[in-house]
A protein has these predicted regions:
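C-terminal catalytic/substrate-binding lobe primarily of soluble NAD(P)-dependent oxidoreductases
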Residues: 1-169
Length: 169
């Protein structure tokens, strides 16, 4: 994946973390993948917060910075659709880091990165330049396991910044 944060996204993330630091009750809400599904608690979900070896794809994976937001939205969609994905639906997003010991080392290193720590990152109103947006890209693998153990893969790719090229015109 090659892309950049908008300043608004960075500011929202920093403000959310600052609010959670002041009000520990927010931490449980932020940690719950079902925070946007009132009254519904689905199947146990992976935390997505630590590097691990993913047995479905047989590779090491690292936490993805947008997963805490995205997973809530996916579970809300399932909720609004009347659990069309199933009551036992499990969803997580991680970044593939690689295979073997090198993959493990890469996953551990990626997990320690915080691209928005301190004063890093764009300010509100800033974001990737036109050139950065046009030269961005992404390659996403959705690996699903059916109840009978059958694996279904879907790949989504884009030749622009993932936050702008495919979501904004």
């Amino acid at each position: 994946m090659k892309g950049g944060f908008s300043g608004g996204t960075a500011a929202s993330l920093k403000a959310t973390m600052a609010a959670a630091a002041k009000d520990p009750s927010l931490i449980a809400l932020l940690a719950s993948p079902f925070a946007l599904t009132p009254g519904h608690k689905g199947a146990h979900q992976p935390t997505g917060l630590i590097p691990e070896h993913d047995t479905t794809i047989d590779a090491w994976v690292a936490p993805f910075v947008m997963a805490p937001i995205n997973t809530k939205n996916v579970h809300r969609t399932n909720f609004l659709l009347g659990q069309r994905y199933g009551d036992d639906f499990v969803y997580d997003e991680m970044m593939v880091a690689g295979l073997g010991e090198m993959g493990k080392a890469a996953a551990e290193a990626l997990a320690k990165l915080n691209p928005l720590a301190g004063d890093k990152g764009p300010k509100p109103g800033e974001g990737p330049t036109k050139e950065e947006r046009e030269n961005g890209s992404y390659d996403v693998l959705f690996a699903g396991l059916m109840p009978d153990g059958t694996r279904i893969d879907a790949v989504v790719t884009g030749d622009r910044d993932p936050g702008y090229g495919s979501t904004l015109s």
